[in-house]
Amino acid sequence: MKEKVWRRNLIILWFGAFMSEGAISIIVPIMPLFLRTLGNYSGKEVNLLTGLIFSITFLVKAVISPLWGKISDQKGHKPMLLKASGGLAFCCLLIAVAPNILIIFIARAIQGVFSGYINNSESMIASQAPASKSGLALGTLATGDTAGLLLGPIIGGVLATFFGFRGTFLIAALLMATVFILSLVLVKEDFHPVPKKSVLGIVETLRAQKLPQVIIIVFIITMLIQATNNAVNPIISMYLSKILHNPSNLTLISGLVSALPGIATVLSATYLGHLGDRFGQTKLLGWALFIGTITYIPQIFITNIWIFSILRFLTGFSIAALLPSAQAILTQNTDHKSLGRIFSYNQTFQALGNVFGMMLSSIVSAYLGYASMFLFVVILELIGLLLAPFTRTNKHLKVKTSSR
């Protein structure tokens, strides 16, 4: 019965992750254009406002995630899924009717408070799937949010063309309302709450694990992963404009090149998760960081669009393995009663990585050039590669999270 429950939940949560990430990424490409309709802003002002509006979500998320993790260990993962999907639906609706940028900024801050559908999906699946299949399960789930991330901008552009900006935000709100209903009706959780007296603080929670140093290292690697992932995409179009001889189709080409890592991730994440279960998640994490480093180094020098595109596609295979393997290592080293809190702390480091990556991308590329930006990404990958061996876990110390 437990086997049937976690597999069914995986299917529902895969769809929920796809819709959730899709709804979020639908907003990304049209937000700067929407802001232009709300006032007489210059290009630089729009760029600054866009950066602030996107960054506030991650900053709030970084602060609030540990609180939600503590609550999830007391109330269960399902209430957190409903909180996140319902909250995002409300935020999309608020943006759709926003009369000015201040309301949009507030909506995005609220989104940071109620975010976490994908992270709680990962935490639920990690707690329900057998330890021997955690990599496969998390890898499969990763294809859902990656597919949403991949298709969202394309769908957003089409919807905005036919329904306008506000209509697109309304559709995103309807998508998240659908996810809320599906999660409410179909997701099952046999939850055994942790008594409030047994809920520890952050330091005590980490010390209570068998290998807290491994968990802390995974947190740092997670931040580095998110920083590298978010450093490149914001500058893709400007970078390509430098190396293309005919930039007339720049928007289309930029979209296609940006999608290549996502395509590779969707194609390979499930299989790579299986390899991690078979040969060890630390090995998979190390190889993924090594491949990422090798594929980023030539991007410092490449000026040919075809070679650059191939390298971006190959980078996607690295991305496909990184977060699932890191999350599987967390699962193996965390007592199931603390899993919600540990995953929420990891979510905080993900959010910090997102902010750091965006800042890295904009500042370094603006003052030192695009080649220097790729060099900094390589340095971050190398730091992760050096840390990866320290996540190795003695098999006898693994914590089985599927005992429920």
Predicted feature locations:
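Juxtamembrane intracellular "pre-TM" segments in multi-pass secondary transporters
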Residues: M1-R7, K188-V218, S403-R404
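Pair of pore-lining "gating" transmembrane helices in MFS-fold secondary transporters
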Residues: V5-L33, T37, L211-A231, F313
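Short amphipathic helix-loop junctions that connect adjacent transmembrane helices
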Residues: I30-N47, I235-L252
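Residue-level signature of mid-helix packing/kink "hotspots" within the transmembrane helices
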Residues: F58-P66, G116, L149-L150, G262-T270, ...
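Conserved MFS/SLC helix-loop-helix module at the cytosolic interface between two early adjacent transmembrane helices
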Residues: A62-I95, P99, G276-T282
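Structural signature of the two symmetry-related core transmembrane helices
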Residues: P79-L94, A173, K283-P298, V378
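Paired small-residue
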Residues: C91, L102-I110, T295, W306-L314
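Cytoplasmic helix-loop-helix junction between adjacent transmembrane helices
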Residues: A107-D145, A328-I329
